[in-house]
Amino acid sequence: NYIDCHGTHEWPIYNRHKNRFDVIETKQMIPDYQTGAENTRKHRYHYQTLFKNFVDGEYKKLPVPPYTLGAWLGDGSNQDGLLYESKQDRCIIERVISDGYSIKWHDVHKTTGVEHFRFDGLRFDLQKVGMCYSYHRCVKHIPEEYFTASISQRMELLAGLLDTDGSLRAKEHRYDFSTTEFRLKDDFITLVSTFGWRCSVSEHEPCLSSSGIQGRKVVYVISFNPTCPIPCVVPRKQLKEFSKPRRVAFCGFERIEPKQGNCIQVEGGVYCAGKRLIPTHNSTLCIFFITWLMGNRPDVASVMSGHSDKLTNGFYGEV
């Protein structure tokens, strides 16, 4: 992940030099952010971001129920409200039915035995989010409103994607999600990032599938280690043991041409930047302004500070 920022922008970090948490400017990390030769056991990065918490979001009435959308993005027909599933994964179909979609048509492929299910009303709902048109192929993607939905809704969306196009490596506590869609690859990473989990991505050249179909597109495999249960309905994809949270390291710095930036300040002191939601520190511009004002016009300004926003707001309410 890349973040454009000023050299004096501050970051809340874990400093491995001092084995403690700290707030440090970007330019202060550049001289000694790593030691040892790369790709050796002695190589290490010294500055790491804070652990990321889940993005709360809010419960929404979504055009397509999250699990069904995830299942369709994984195993659905691009131009119809169809899902393709094997007989052993019939639980996925039952889960879609529980979202309110009845089976309109059902067929079984004579060679592979894969079952085809068309659901009544699914295509109409998918068209509300700009997908599933019969006259042209759409770009499968996760609509923006789903990224800010509630935690439970985003979990259901993730479960639908993993039940269809995911695989579980239980010994490594890791899920792999595979797709040939470039945008869906990016959207999946963004979705996983809303839970504070980091991903790794690998690319694989087209190959012959287990069903005998020759692939024609590059396959993207996104891997991540969750720290809590994901509500998958396929039994073999239900993870029982979980990884501990891991910090993200600063692994490189590059000077770029100056560009327009904005100072941001939020109540909590830390906000998330970039598509991968990297924790970063508040702007200190307001503090500098108040200091300047008190120094230059002490006769017209007064400042009240407190360790609690409720106390501070209460004080000004009484005034």
What residue ranges belong to the model's regions?
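Beta-rich nucleic-acid/ligand-interaction surfaces
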Residues: 201-224
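Alpha-helical scaffold elements adjacent to nucleotide-binding pockets in ATP/GTP-utilizing enzyme cores
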Residues: 95, 187, 191, 220-221, ...
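Terminal recognition/anchoring or ligand-binding modules at protein termini
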Residues: 183, 188-189, 216-219, 226-227
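Phosphate/NTP-binding elements of NTP-utilizing enzymes
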Residues: 283-319
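Short secondary-structure boundary/capping segments
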Residues: 99, 237-238, 319
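Surface-exposed, non-catalytic interaction/assembly patches
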Residues: 227-257
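C-terminal extracytoplasmic interaction modules
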Residues: 97, 118-120, 220-222, 226-232
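Intein-associated homing endonuclease modules of the LAGLIDADG/DOD-type, together
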Residues: 1-208, 246-282
